[in-house]
């Protein structure tokens, strides 16, 4: 973390490389979010209602409590960790403190609302279908922003270069004398 905090990660090519490759995977995660959503629904509240409540016209059964619980059980830790990772790295980017706090709160709030919206549609009121559509769009925009902002932050000033001869060498510690 000290490399991120003081900006010296720019000189740590392997650290930048691993972070950039992780962001490649998270970009794939972000793209597949769209594919999964649009395979089941579209951006209309009616499609959300049909998916969660079922539709006689389309021969769709309503989502069961058990199936929703299984999806939520895997989504909560995964999405929580993704948002934690992205917002944690954003802490070291050159944004104002107030903006960082807003981005962090928005990221976690949108993730929670997006996950909760399906439950609200299914077990509270079909009127929450608008919440599902809105939070899906907003959360995907937030994920896209975080990934893009971090790529720009990591690419700033230099590009990750890996020297295979020195890749296994540890950086020399600085001589920090107490005053």
Identify the function of each model-found stretch.
Residues 62-81, 90:
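Individual transmembrane alpha-helix segments
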């Amino acid at each position: 973390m000290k490399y991120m905090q003081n900006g010296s990660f720019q000189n740590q090519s392997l650290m930048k490389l691993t972070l950039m490759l992780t962001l490649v995977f998270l970009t794939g995660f972000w793209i597949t979010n769209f594919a999964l959503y649009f395979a089941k629904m579209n951006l209309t509240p009616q499609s959300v209602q049909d998916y969660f409540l079922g539709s006689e016209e389309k021969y769709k059964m309503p989502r069961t409590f058990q199936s929703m619980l299984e999806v939520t059980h895997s989504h909560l830790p995964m999405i929580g960790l993704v948002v934690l990772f992205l917002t944690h790295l954003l802490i070291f980017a050159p944004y104002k403190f107030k903006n960082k706090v807003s981005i962090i709160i928005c990221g976690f709030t949108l993730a929670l609302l997006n996950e909760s919206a399906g439950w609200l549609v299914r077990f509270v009121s079909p009127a929450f279908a608008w919440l599902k559509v809105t939070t899906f769009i907003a959360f995907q925009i937030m994920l896209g922003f975080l990934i893009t902002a971090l790529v720009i932050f990591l690419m700033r000033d230099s590009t990750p270069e890996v020297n295979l001869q020195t890749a296994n060498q540890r950086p020399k510690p600085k001589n920090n004398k107490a005053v």
